[in-house]
Amino acid sequence: VHLEFDKLQVLQSAFITAQTGRVTGVLGRNGCGKSCLFKCIMGGIKPQNIFIRFNDETETDYGHIGKRIRYLPQNVFIPADMTLGEAFRLYGVDYDGLVAFDNKFHTYQRLRSSQLSGGEVRIAEMYMVLNSEAEFCILDEPFSNVAPKHVEMMQNLINEHKATKGIIISDHMYESVMGITDDLFLLRDGYTFPIKSREDLIHHGYILR
């Protein structure tokens, strides 16, 4: 992906891969372009150049891409005036599964997303994305506003679903990301760098030690 705004280089030959059975992590500082990268993939931002391939076949139709990849953006995507039950029906995901995942949601089905905490909405949205029929999922800041107990539950859910999906995840809780990723990239200065160890993150200046 190559993306620039008014000659400001945001992404320069940024490159990531994902495959079924593996979790790919993308780390980077605030403003480095992680969300821009994901939006380019999903068609939310039109870059100067992008190349998307599924199993060696190039894909340019964003309608098809949207069916094959489901995206959890940084911001809430369930409308504030929509109930959780309605959102799950529209997304084609069984609400009872969410209740089985976390029983506190058994009384939330008729509540609007605006009536829930940020962490509760995040859990519900991530559950929807992971349980969709898409082949791949992109999770942008899934652990935002989520309590540590539920972060662990969400990590387990990601590991469960990677058996049938390719999952890309980015979050500032880098240790939580590193704990579940099979492949890891760092986005810096518009480029992606493969990360093999914690020492690589230190080398690139992402962490101090």
Language model: regions and residue ranges:
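ABC ATPase NBD coupling module
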Residues: K46, E57-R70, G205
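Conserved H-loop
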Residues: M173-G179
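Conserved structural motif at the start of ABC-family nucleotide-binding domains
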Residues: L11-S13
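Helix-to-loop junction immediately C-terminal to a conserved catalytic motif
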Residues: M42
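Walker B catalytic motif
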Residues: E141-P142
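Conserved beta-strand-loop-alpha-helix hinge in the C-terminal portion
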Residues: Y191-R209
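Q-loop/switch helix immediately C-terminal to the Walker
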Residues: Y71, N75, A80-Y95
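The feature captures the beta-strand-to-loop junction immediately N-terminal to the Walker
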Residues: L27-R29
